[in-house]
Amino acid sequence: MAKKKQNTENYLAQNRKARFNYAIAETFEAGISLTGTEIKSVRAGQITIGDGFVTIHNGNALLTNVHISSYVQGNQFNVDPLRTRQLLLHKREIRVLEKATQEQGVTIVPLKVYLKHGFAKVLVGIGRGKKKYDKREDIKKRDQERELSRRFKN
């Protein structure tokens, strides 16, 4: 009998600052519409999502300000590294995202980029911007957890 492959979460890019700067309420998994040279660059890990965000325009979810480096062997087929890319979501998911962004202070941010069954996927989250004191509370909690883990380790 064939062995099942283990589900190892292998992230190509992760937006660590997103959970620090935003309170993430809900997440969605979306496909990304990429060209051939772009997917090769993504598989090589040449993607930066730190400054990225998602906009809804004419019923389409668009990933903006995400940098995918040019593929080295791609020459004439390379495209603009910062071009806007379409996210592949169901219509009801797009409606939920569009309704959420109608509120003041709510944005859609990419959290992680990973491969799933050979396809590039992005995990996007609906986030509300945190205040400075909320960020300080998060830092205090994190420091307390580290201190507890050190005590239990020794």
From Swiss-Prot:
Keywords: Cytoplasm, RNA-binding
Region feature (Disordered): 134-154
SUPFAM superfamilies tied to this protein: Small protein B (SmpB)
Pfam families xref list: SmpB
InterPro entries: SmpB, SsrA-bd_prot, SsrA-bd_prot_CS
HAMAP family reported in the protein's UniProt record: SmpB
Protein name: SsrA-binding protein
Species name: Leuconostoc mesenteroides subsp. mesenteroides (strain ATCC 8293 / DSM 20343 / BCRC 11652 / CCM 1803 / JCM 6124 / NCDO 523 / NBRC 100496 / NCIMB 8023 / NCTC 12954 / NRRL B-1118 / 37Y)
